[in-house]
Each structure stands twice: as C-alpha cells, then as structure tokens.
Amino acid sequence: MKKKSIKDKEQENNWEEKVVQVKRVTKVVKGGKKLSFRAILIVGNEKGEIGVGIGKASDVIGAVKKGVTDAKKHIINVPLTKSYSIPHPIEGISGAAKVILRPSAIGSGVIAGGSTRTVLELAGVKNILAKQLRSSNTLNNARAVLNALSQLRTFQNTAQNRDINIERLFNM
C-alpha cells in the first residue's frame, strides 16, 4: 500500500490559508541592518481543524511558505455543535493577550475582530461571540484563540472523564 504524502493530505482536506500579517523586521549586525520579513499565517479546512504558524525569510514569498508549513505542524481539532458554534464558553491566554469565546444563537454570525475572527472562520465556526482583552498583538491573540479552542470539551468527553453515560450527565 502506498504511503500518503503531504500533498495528498493537502488535496484531501482542502486547506485554506490566510495571511494575517506581514511585517518587516531588522537585525542589527556588524555591517549595518539586515532586513527580513515575518509572516503570520492561519491554515484551516472549515471543518474543525485549524493551525497558526510563523515564517521568517529574506523575501515575503519565502516567509509565507515557511508560515504555511509551520501552521500545518500545529493543527488542532475543534469540536463544533450542530449550529456550528462551540459547546461552552471558554477563555484562552497567550502572553498578555486574553480571549473570551461564547457560543451564540443560530444566525448571529461570527462577532469578533482582528486575527480572532480569521481563526474562527477558518476553523468552521459560524455562530460565536468573541472578545479580545489586554493586548492588540495579532500573533498573541491568534494563539490565545487556539489555546481556548484546544481546551473545548464535548459532552461525550466530559461523560468519559467522569466514567458515566451521557444520559446521567444530563440528569445531574
């Protein structure tokens, strides 16, 4: 049986990539300043899989390519409800950035700003309320959302952790 390559997996999952930020950064060396680019990318398949990555290179295209490979290395699965929302409210922290995510009613849409909105849309979340607190840093806010989404638990996970069946969980 043939082993699946990375390109086969890419075509299978239909990954969508979005560049959130491209920044010119400099490094001071003996001969002067060395210029390079840093790209922050978000990769998702809109079916509950999402990843955030960073790429640095001397040109923008190289930085974007490195960012895509980095994002695909850090992919997490997000449990979504039937209404394409999250199962319960949650908070995520990365650095100084704090993000609060709350499930929302059908038809309310993605109410979020900046990189938080991009992460949630590429994850496949369609109804959610989000608020960024304490920091406006693009990278830390994206990572805070990823941190929050990775902490989400379904009813089945909770029931298994407590060693009870789902019906008993609802009767409590």
Swiss-Prot record:
The record's note on its domains: The N-terminal domain interacts with the head of the 30S subunit; the C-terminal domain interacts with the body and contacts protein S4. The interaction surface between S4 and S5 is involved in control of translational fidelity.
Protein's UniProt name = Small ribosomal subunit protein uS5c
One Pfam family name from the record? Ribosomal_S5
Principal location listed in the UniProt entry: plastid
The record's subcellular locations are: Plastid, Chloroplast
Write down any Gene Ontology CC term.
small ribosomal subunit
Q: Name one GO biological process term.
A: translation
Q: Where is the S5 DRBM domain?
A: 15-78
**What keywords is this UniProt entry annotated with?**
Chloroplast, Plastid, Ribonucleoprotein, Ribosomal protein, RNA-binding, rRNA-binding
| Molecular functions (GO terms) | rRNA binding; structural constituent of ribosome
